[in-house]
Amino acid sequence: SWLSTVTKTSARMSEKVGTATVTVPKDKLPEPLRSIINDLEEIADYVTRGVPLANDYVKGVVYAYLKQGVCGETEHTPTTRVALSISCIMDACKYNAIYPDTAATNCIREYISTLLHEVAHVVSGAPDGSTLFERSLTNLLGYSVTNTFTYYKEIKQYVDRIISKLAGPPPQ
């Protein structure tokens, strides 16, 4: 299946790259992963609307094969940007014909929480556990909750699209 092929490729890439980050242009990602990511990005745009700097970094996110077990990282060269792990997104966004809404919830939660964590690093310029980072993450958490209420109808369209994609059937 496409999933096992991409998963094997991902594992090979992780071994090869070690700690280096190999980004993959979004248009080179396989379907339906690419269209699920497009929907996730739309949701992320709504939940970070009006947050100084954060929304810009959300719009500039890249996708990469990161070191195994790492789901997101902040890069500073050549420019500051957030990289999210293709493998982690695929693990979180699995087909589930029986419980597609639960699958979609897990997919969205994993994507948004990892993204907001990394964006908090970029915005604060601070490491895990520092007061600046905690303040930045707390601010993003507050915005994401209130924006979810504010933009509920808009966000729901993208959630429904993800649900239908995760309900299958998987492409061959």
What are these regions, as identified by a protein language model?
Residues 1-12, 101-107, 122-123:
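Charged regulatory segments coupled to nucleotide-binding catalytic modules in large multidomain enzymes
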Residues 1-65:
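A metal-dependent hydrolase signature that marks the N-terminal structural subdomain at the beginning
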Residues 40-52, 119-120, 137-145:
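Hydrophobic, Leu/Ile/Phe/Ala-enriched alpha-helical segments that form helix-helix packing faces
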Residues 54-93:
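Catalytic zinc-binding patch centered on the HExxH motif and its immediate surroundings
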Residues 70, 126-171:
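Post-HExxH zinc-binding segment in Zn-dependent metallohydrolases
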Residues 108-112:
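Alpha-helical scaffolds flanking conserved acidic
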Residues 113-125:
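Active-site recognition of the HExxH zinc-binding catalytic motif
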